[in-house]
């Protein structure tokens, strides 16, 4: 019973870590990063399709991203979707590929992004703590109902605390790395 609860909590915490990674990839750093466009949807023959399924990405230098559509007829729609995306880049279409030159981030913008990273990190840490709370409640109920002994419940709680601490520290480390990346000029 305790092991299943711990395993379930760990799976939930691991999903939170993955969500944190995805959130941090979508934060712009001034470098060309294909991950910025992972959530861009393109109107392709009447249905919205993720950009990653319609084109390949290449970085030609630190600030230039080259997007090559698999189907040339989708070029205009891809350009339109990129222009309307929240990333804030200006795509240029040369008829075969789309080039995006990432503008240099201002110091003020970098600070805003650092705040955003901190806030996202805090949201994800709360999610980890909520998973811990749910698991602890399940363990306490099992002990109270007599399904497991108090010693086993206490041992499970210690493991749960270690698991929570490890995941929170991982989120902190990811946030610190992203902040350093943002503040690097």
From Swiss-Prot:
Key word Membrane present: no
GO molecular function: ribosomal large subunit binding
Pfam family, one: RRF
Region Disordered: start-end pairs: 138-160
GO CC terms, sorted: cytoplasm
Subcellular location: Cytoplasm
Principal subcellular localization: cytoplasm
Gene Ontology BP terms: translational termination
Stated role: Responsible for the release of ribosomes from messenger RNA at the termination of protein biosynthesis. May increase the efficiency of translation by recycling ribosomes from one round of translation to another.
Listed name of the protein: Ribosome-recycling factor
Organism for this UniProt entry: Micrococcus luteus (strain ATCC 4698 / DSM 20030 / JCM 1464 / CCM 169 / CCUG 5858 / IAM 1056 / NBRC 3333 / NCIMB 9278 / NCTC 2665 / VKM Ac-2230) (Micrococcus lysodeikticus)
Lineage, highest ranks first: Bacteria, Bacillati, Actinomycetota, Actinomycetes, Micrococcales
């Amino acid at each position: 019973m305790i092991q299943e609860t711990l395993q379930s909590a760990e799976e939930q915490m691991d999903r939170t870590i993955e969500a944190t990674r995805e959130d941090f990839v979508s934060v712009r750093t001034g470098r060309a990063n294909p991950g910025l466009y992972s959530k861009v949807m393109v109107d392709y023959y009447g249905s919205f399709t993720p950009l990653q399924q319609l084109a390949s990405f290449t970085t030609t230098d630190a600030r230039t991203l080259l997007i090559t559509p698999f189907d040339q007829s989708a070029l205009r729609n891809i350009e339109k979707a990129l222009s309307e995306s929240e990333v804030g880049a200006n795509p240029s279409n040369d008829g075969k590929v789309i080039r995006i030159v990432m503008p240099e981030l201002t110091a003020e913008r970098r600070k805003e992004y650092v705040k955003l990273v901190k806030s996202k990190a805090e949201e994800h840490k709360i999610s980890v703590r909520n998973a811990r709370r749910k698991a602890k409640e399940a363990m306490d109920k099992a002990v109270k109902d007599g399904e497991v002994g108090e010693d086993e419940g206490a041992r499970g709680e210690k493991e749960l605390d270690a698991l929570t601490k490890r995941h929170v520290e991982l989120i902190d480390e990811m946030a610190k790395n992203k902040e350093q990346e943002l503040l690097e000029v």
